[in-house]
Amino acid sequence: MMTAKAVDKIPVTLSGFMHQLPDSLYPVEDLAASSVTIFPNGELGGPFDQMNGVAGDGMINIDMTGEKRPLDLPYPSSFAPISAPRNQTFTYMGKFSIDPQYPGASCYPEGIINIVSAGILQGVTPPASTTASSSVTSASPNPLATGPLGVCTMSQTQPELDHLYSPPPPPPPYSGCTGDLYQDPSAFLSPPSTTSTSSLAYQPPPSYPSPKPAMDPGLIPMIPDYPGFFPSPCQRDPHGAAGPDRKPFPCPLDSLRVPPPLTPLSTIRNFTLGGPGAGVTGPGASGGGEGPRLPGSGSAAVTATPYNPHHLPLRPILRPRKYPNRPSKTPVHERPYPCPAEGCDRRFSRSDELTRHIRIHTGHKPFQCRICMRNFSRSDHLTTHIRTHTGEKPFACDYCGRKFARSDERKRHTKIHLRQKERKSSAPSAPPSAQSSASGPGGSQAGGSLCGNSAIGGPLASCTSRTRTP
């Protein structure tokens, strides 16, 4: 709030506000019996309680007519003019309209700061050396006033004219008011003239609390914890203060690792709704090798989580090879990738085969089923596992039409049909060979040899020979 503190017994000349008045303009004998106080379009109470209204021209309005005429003041009947001796001079009261620097920052619609200059000089002085003196006070609009511009409070006492001003109460913290409204009043007052008989002893105005509370640089405002706008507790500083060495991700990076790939739901839905045999079509079901693959279950859709196998410990294989000494079909010089695990003599011709083999030692299973959350070390194992959930059986037997989910199962089943075929082909050729061996001279010997020398059905042949003999 722009409020100036009045000092005791400080005469101030009006030479800084207007031009010097001629000495012969107002003779002493023509002075009015009482001092004239001029407030255009104003309203004064007994003790100068209130002042409402401001002239729209924004200039200094001072009535200094020298003719003797009754005062035509639009004041209420409760106002009693202050009687003064004849030797008193005029009272010059002016009004200044100053536009604020920032019109939008003020709370008041008029945007005007009033500065009232009032004072009475006591004592008789010659007209030639008499100067119009006054004490300058500045009053700013009080936000607590009921009028449009506020209240200016003044009190007149003894002939010494001790102006006593009580500092106004601090204004409430309005949201629209800013610190730009409360400026130093010394910027609006003109410096004292060097030709005046008295000097201006100006003191800085008292400091009043600003509507904006001062922010301590060492304190940080507490903000409510909204989980939708702030990170998780593991990413927040537990002490609430952000230091210069704060990292963007204080949590361990293991929790931010990309999750392993899952089986697409579209793959599961397609084969579940289509039935167990939906994936089997025409020659693909009866042809050799693998049948049609699941859409999205190939190597393009299922990828392993990136990892470094050198950082994982290599453990020995729990189940060793069934035939460890069996030679490989590929020569050793064509298998340049040996297994680094201790006690494992496997060698591979391609690096991807070695990578897939190392997962056996490390136990890394980057492929996960989306239905049962089971992990697998190889993508083809995951593909065949998904078929247990969907019921897909793309591999059918060529002999009986039985369907299988895996090609090795169908291959194992096909061997059964091959063995049965071999037995059927060998069964019709046995009776002709037996008949040719039995035919010839000496039927009894042939019959004895049939019964006694039968290696396959010896007891059965002896029983039949006994029954045939009389």
Curated annotation (Swiss-Prot):
Zinc finger region(s), C2H2-type: 337-361, 367-389, 395-417
One GO-annotated biological process of the protein: brain segmentation
Gene Ontology terms for molecular function: chromatin binding; DNA binding; DNA-binding transcription activator activity, RNA polymerase II-specific; DNA-binding transcription factor activity; DNA-binding transcription factor activity, RNA polymerase II-specific; RNA polymerase II cis-regulatory region sequence-specific DNA binding; RNA polymerase II-specific DNA-binding transcription factor binding; sequence-specific DNA binding
Annotated metabolic or biological route of this protein: Protein modification; protein sumoylation
Region of interest (Disordered), ranges: 126-153, 159-178, 185-210, 275-345, 408-470
Compositional bias of kind Gly residues: 275-291, 440-450
Catalytic activity, EC: 2.3.2.-
Top-level taxon in the UniProt lineage: Eukaryota
UniProt feature, compositional bias: Basic residues: 412-422
Residue stretches of biased makeup (Low complexity): 126-141, 190-202, 426-439
Single GO cellular component term: nucleoplasm
Key words, A-Z: Acetylation, Activator, DNA-binding, Metal-binding, Nucleus, Repeat, Transcription, Transcription regulation, Transferase, Ubl conjugation, Ubl conjugation pathway, Zinc, Zinc-finger
Pfam families the UniProt entry points to: DUF3446, zf-C2H2
Modified residues (N6-acetyllysine): K247
Cell location: Nucleus
Family of the protein in this entry: Belongs to the EGR C2H2-type zinc-finger protein family.
Entry function: Sequence-specific DNA-binding transcription factor. Plays a role in hindbrain segmentation by regulating the expression of a subset of homeobox containing genes and in Schwann cell myelination by regulating the expression of genes involved in the formation and maintenance of myelin. Binds to two EGR2-consensus sites EGR2A (5'-CTGTAGGAG-3') and EGR2B (5'-ATGTAGGTG-3') in the HOXB3 enhancer and promotes HOXB3 transcriptional activation. Binds to specific DNA sites located in the promoter region of HOXA4, HOXB2 and ERBB2. E3 SUMO-protein ligase helping SUMO1 conjugation to its coregulators NAB1 and NAB2, whose sumoylation down-regulates EGR2 transcriptional activity.
Assembly and binders: Interacts with HCFC1. Interacts with WWP2. Interacts with UBC9. Interacts with CITED1. Interacts (via phosphorylated form) with SFN.
Name of the molecule in the record: E3 SUMO-protein ligase EGR2
Gene: Egr2
